Amino acid sequence: MSSSALQVAKTGTYLPDLVEVQRASFKWFLEKGLIEELQNFSPISDYTGKLELHFIGEEYRLKRPRHDVEEAKRRDATFASQMYVTCRLINKETGEIKEQEVFIGELPLMTERGTFIINGAERVIVNQIVRSPGVYFKDEQDKNGRRTYNASVIPNRGAWLKFETDKNNLLYVRVDKTRKINAHVLMRAMGLSDNDVVDKLRHPEFYQNSIESANDEGINSEDQALLELYKKLRPGEPPSVSGGQQLLFSRFFDPKRYDLGRVGRYKINKKLRLTVPDDVRTLTHEDVLSTIDYLINLELDIGGASLDDIDHLGNRRVRSVGELLQNQVRVGLNRLERIIKERMTVGETDSLTPAQLVNPKPLVAAIKEFFGSSQLSQFMDQTNPLAELTHKRRISALGPGGLTRERAGFAVRDIHPSHYGRLCPIETPEGPNAGLINSLATHARVNEYGFIETPFWKVNNGKVNKDGDPIYLSADLEDECRVAPGDVATDKDGNILANLIPVRYRQDFEKVPPEQVDYVQLSPVQVISVATSLIPFLEHDDANRALMGSNMQRQAVPLLRPERPLVGTGLESQVARDSGMVPITKVNGTVSYVDANEIVVKGEDGNEHFHYLQKYQRSNQDTCLNQRPIVNIGDQVISGQVLADGSACEGGEIALGQNVLIAYMPWEGYNYEDAILVSERMVTDDLYTSVHIEKYEIEARQTKLGPEEITREIPNISEDSLNNLDEMGIIRIGAFVESGDILVGKVTPKGESDQPPEEKLLRAIFGEKARDVRDNSLRVPKTEKGRVLDVRIYTREQGDELPPGANMVVRVYVAQRRKIQVGDKMAGRHGNKGIISRILPREDMPYLPDGTPVDIVLNPLGVPSRMNVGQVFELLMGWAASNLNCRVKVVPFDEMYGAEKSHQTVQAFLEEASKQPGKAWIYNPEDPGKLLLKDGRTGEPFDQPVAVGYSHFLKLVHLVDDKIHARSTGPYSLVTQQPLGGKAQQGGQRLGEMEVWALEAYGAAYTLQELLTVKSDDMQGRNEALNAIVKGKPIPRPGTPESFKVLMRELQSLGLDIGVYTDEGKEVDLMQDINPRRNTPSRPTYESLGTSEYEED
């Protein structure tokens, strides 16, 4: 094989651990964050100052969790540990000290995979990106078009302070967006004299106006300034000097109320070139004076002063699990503080102990609230390993303290030059969240201040130095360096070859000689996220389609027999490993035992290490989690080696779909508008068959009439229907069930009033009490079927926690195999998606010169306008690889190996493949990449040669079985009486505004009238219509829609005298059918029609 053909994966480095961002943050919380909060919280004094309670934060202790991860999932419990802290109660009067270890609450623990188990469900805490605390200088235009400058001091928590200038060169200050105050009033209130201020400013003449303005207002002393400040901040309250001092202290100088945080202090010191110590977290006089000085320099346009870009990643920081949890603990501890103070006041001083004072409930509630209902605590996307991994690396600008979808403008959502190597410019959702939810780039990491860093190699005098570890730079530091991209061509010693190199410097592009380059990127892949880096030939795809490709890989359903891609990018194995879906050995050793359930590795020290495999477990998205061993007894393994394949993995690599033979050609209109024509081979050979596991649950509750019972004795059910139930009335494992079959038999006690008349008659005649129960069994829903995989029974006797009022809970897991069918959605990795329109017998499919029928026929018109040509490169490279019987790894952005390298490489591979014996036909130099196909139905060749090859195609989670839905009668909305919407509500099909236009265009008047009346909210009309249909009579004239009556009532409630009148001017009583309607159900059913109504008149 020619050397030029084999330019494959040379990423230069392995990626860092992809879940590190989650794990490192939680580790910081356990080691520092929690201790920090407990120390800040301590000591607590009572209102008299006699008692003091100290928390010895560094001595906190975590108990071993009650359940392990698997048991917590099984029992619907939380995987959490109990927290204990040593508390010291000091009585200052007597000098008595009581020390005790106190329980302060349960802390959910992170699993090894970076997730949390909350109430049995696996959840992920998404990282949040927020504006960093610090000082920001901005310019604005006032209404006269004059440019004004302002400075905002933003703390981590506390009041914002904003300085601004006006046209008279006066300086004003606002506290938390209140009214403007002369800046010098604040200076005097803070105890600074005129000379203190003037001495600190480089251009005091600008500030002189503000001093004179304050003097003109008669504010000459500190006391007067405090009174003025109090008046402005608390209008309507009587001002006092002490009140002003208290207000100023609590707003800016009280560490409990105002906190810049470590990051805020770091940013302010850096921006204003100060040397205030890191542990001073409140405002200082120096901060305020330096801010005013900087603002004046901006006004006077003096060098060195620059405006801030709030979208720059140097000014936005990431809050990960640890910090979010720390903030929540702070909330809980503040609630606890109030309780402790109250108890100190109320209780007997002598007999009080720390345990009596500390109530764990507020802290438990705060933590529970965060994990259970915070916007950032999300139900993990477990569709496949990539979805799980991407979810853990997601960065959201939404959430508490962040942006909202409605408020976010274009600037926040846009790609910023500082995103380079930090946030992926491609992977983001389509729709309202575009640009607000991002993904961390492959090599990015979050530093101790929460800023995203990315690695570089140092360049010394034109030579790339790859010895040692790469250097990580944050966006601020990188701006001051000249950075070359990762695909710069170098010789084998690392010397840069070109004479002029494109570099990024201060967010602009320049060309400089190699000697001036400071750093070079680590890898061409470091700009993009993990999902995007799995797309081969990415550089040939339009960004919009690459975005769809990245997002759709996360929706790929794990298949029964996954197959890794013929054309990959070299990152597949690391994605599988870091996702946590594959078991990995932590020791060097030998495999001593393997079966489907466990693998035992005997370490070099002689100890046995057990790895238990997941078997057919249900994921959060109802896909199947199953692990299959890939090692044999006697195999030598090394630490970090994969022992088994998880779902959507093969050979330790991620395998989301199948490599199938694809032809790009139109076929009888069946691939019009992105539809896909597939061969029956995909169905018969189970290429795209997947297993889905549904969970069905039923509770036996305590009712007023007695307990519900789970039993086999169900009234009016034939013995045949009970065949698969055991003696308790629960379905046996392994049974095949279809829609309507009983899974769990349950009877509910029935009151006397529930008896139908015939039952009462039987009672009166025979005097015997028939069993007073109603059938309330759990049945398989419509359109569902499958095989019972597992049954779990939960009772209080076994120690299970059940919902209030429930005596027993039974869960049945049903697995179904879903073959590919018409209506399923499929996609490639380049954003080329479509719906299956027809499944053809393989003998009718177009076939190759050697007789092989193709698997999929796609429309060639889907390529040019979408500009995702990467799919064509993948197709031909896959064609060459399958004929050479090898797999290829192609790193994106391969121009570093020479111009047009992708094109040359694919061509060289095809030529190489055609040199195989008997394979000359696979490559035609006259028409490279195309073959003359024949029609399977006639055997005639098609007119034109067709592009054919192997591509990796995925089956997506949007399956037609989950979407198909029909309704004849069903539930109605209570207010409007219109049918509900959606499959889950058994809703109707909405004909919206545009569909109505279409009917209007055809003049379909009666159809339109039915849509507005009997098919919707004409309550009487729809009951009569159903009656007429059942009896075969003509449908009567429709009545008045309920929504019209609601509208009339709403207008009347506004005090408008509005009514409906006939042509003759007679008022129509819209409510005349109210009384008869009370007796008819709002939901027409066949039972509601009495037997007499069926009889012909």
Curated annotation (Swiss-Prot):
GO terms for biological process: DNA-templated transcription. Keywords: DNA-directed RNA polymerase, Nucleotidyltransferase, Transcription, Transferase. Residues 1077-1091 have a biased composition (Polar residues). The keyword Repeat does not apply. Residues 1073-1097 are annotated as: Disordered. Pfam families: RNA_pol_Rpb2_1, RNA_pol_Rpb2_2, RNA_pol_Rpb2_3, RNA_pol_Rpb2_45, RNA_pol_Rpb2_6, RNA_pol_Rpb2_7. Its EC number is 2.7.7.6. It comes from the Bacteria. In cyanobacteria the RNAP catalytic core is composed of 2 alpha, 1 beta, 1 beta', 1 gamma and 1 omega subunit. When a sigma factor is associated with the core the holoenzyme is formed, which can initiate transcription. This is DNA-directed RNA polymerase subunit beta. It comes from Prochlorococcus marinus (strain MIT 9312). The lineage of its organism: Bacteria, Bacillati, Cyanobacteriota, Cyanophyceae, Synechococcales.
